[in-house]
Amino acid sequence: MARSIWKGPFVDGYLIKKVQKLMESGKSEMIKTWSRRSTILPIFVGFTFSVHNGNKFIPVSVNEEMVGRKLGEFAPTRTFYGHGADKKVKRK
C-alpha cells in the first residue's frame, strides 16, 4: 500500500540539511547515511550518497530517473552466489 498523498514523501530531516549545506558551499562531497527509507527528492539530483547496506556503505549517484524512489533500492543488502552445481555431471 502506498503512502498517503496528503502526508508527502518521507525524508529524514538531517539529509535535507546536509544537502542544503553542500548546495550553499558549492562542494560535492559524499553524504554518508544509514537512512535507506528516505525518498529521493529533486534537490538530491547530482549528489552522491553513501548508503549503508548492513555491512558497508554503497555509493549511489542520484540522477533524474531516481526521483521518487527510496535510497535503499540502490544499495542491495543480499548477495546471490548462484545455485549449487549438479554433483552428478554426465559425460559422454
Swiss-Prot record:
Cystine residue pairs: none
Keyword entries, A-Z: Ribonucleoprotein, Ribosomal protein, RNA-binding, rRNA-binding
InterPro entries according to UniProt: Ribosomal_uS19, Ribosomal_uS19_bac-type, Ribosomal_uS19_CS, Ribosomal_uS19_SF
Gene3D superfamilies: 30s Ribosomal Protein S19, Chain A
MF annotations from Gene Ontology: rRNA binding; structural constituent of ribosome
GO biological process per UniProt: ribosomal small subunit assembly; translation
Record's GO cellular component terms: cytoplasm; small ribosomal subunit
Summary of the function given for this chain in its UniProt record: Protein S19 forms a complex with S13 that binds strongly to the 16S ribosomal RNA.
Similarity annotation: Belongs to the universal ribosomal protein uS19 family.
Family annotation (PANTHER family): RIBOSOMAL PROTEIN S19P FAMILY MEMBER, SMALL RIBOSOMAL SUBUNIT PROTEIN US19M
Protein name according to UniProt: Small ribosomal subunit protein uS19
